[in-house]
């Protein structure tokens, strides 16, 4: 059996521009592509944290070190400059590959420079203010004890 698994993601990147009159795709800084193991032409899902939009497109390499995350074509109706997005690539793997594979998770700063690399898809960097599902039972217990 084959399974579709998260291969890599760039988490909370800031959209630098959106161009409606482009042929499509998302332009991504080549440094981020390398960190996330993305290839030009590879399919990605873009999740807009600000408005909840989800869309699929493909990656085009942007200038290395530029921090570019450019939304191109019709997707510019859904995702605007300044929006925070998650870019997710999936891979189809057999059972053995699933057990051996470690995804690439790239957290970026406000300038879209990588600040943390990892393999845990549910990890939240310390000090980020993000909540990981692995913390929910602890948070629920803290909330309950504060109500008593």
From Swiss-Prot:
GO cellular component, one term: cytosol
Signal peptide coordinates: none
Main location class: cytoplasm
Enzyme class: lyase
Residues reported in the UniProt entry to bind substrate: 57, 73-75
Localization: Cytoplasm
Keyword Ubl conjugation carried by entry: no
UniProt-recorded Gene Ontology molecular function terms: aspartate 1-decarboxylase activity
Xref: Gene3D superfamilies: 2.40.40.20
Cofactor note: Binds 1 pyruvoyl group covalently per subunit.
Catalytic site: 25, 58
PTM section of the record: Is synthesized initially as an inactive proenzyme, which is activated by self-cleavage at a specific serine bond to produce a beta-subunit with a hydroxyl group at its C-terminus and an alpha-subunit with a pyruvoyl group at its N-terminus.
Pfam families registered for this protein in UniProt: Asp_decarbox
InterPro entries reported in the protein's UniProt record: Asp_de-COase-like_dom_sf, Asp_decarbox
Cofactor annotation: pyruvate
Pathway per the UniProt entry: Cofactor biosynthesis; (R)-pantothenate biosynthesis; beta-alanine from L-aspartate: step 1/1
Reactions it catalyzes: L-aspartate + H(+) = beta-alanine + CO2
Modified residues (Pyruvic acid (Ser)): 25
Family: Belongs to the PanD family.
Described function: Catalyzes the pyruvoyl-dependent decarboxylation of aspartate to produce beta-alanine.
Name of the protein this chain belongs to: Aspartate 1-decarboxylase
Taxonomic source organism: Rhodococcus jostii (strain RHA1)
């Amino acid at each position: 059996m084959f399974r579709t698994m998260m291969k890599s993601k760039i988490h909370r990147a800031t959209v630098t521009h959106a161009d409606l009159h482009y042929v499509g795709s998302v332009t991504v800084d080549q440094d981020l592509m390398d960190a996330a193991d993305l290839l030009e032409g590879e399919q990605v899902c873009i999740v807009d944290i600000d408005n909840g939009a989800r869309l699929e497109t493909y990656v085009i390499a942007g200038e290395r070190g530029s921090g570019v995350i450019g939304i191109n074509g019709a997707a510019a109706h859904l995702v605007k400059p300044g929006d925070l997005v998650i870019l997710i690539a999936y891979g189809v793997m057999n059972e053995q590959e699933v057990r051996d594979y470690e995804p690439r998770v790239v957290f970026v700063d406000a300038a879209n420079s990588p600040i943390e690399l990892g393999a845990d898809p549910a990890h939240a960097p310390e000090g980020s203010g993000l909540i990981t599902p692995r913390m929910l039972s602890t948070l629920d217990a803290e909330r309950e004890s504060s109500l008593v």
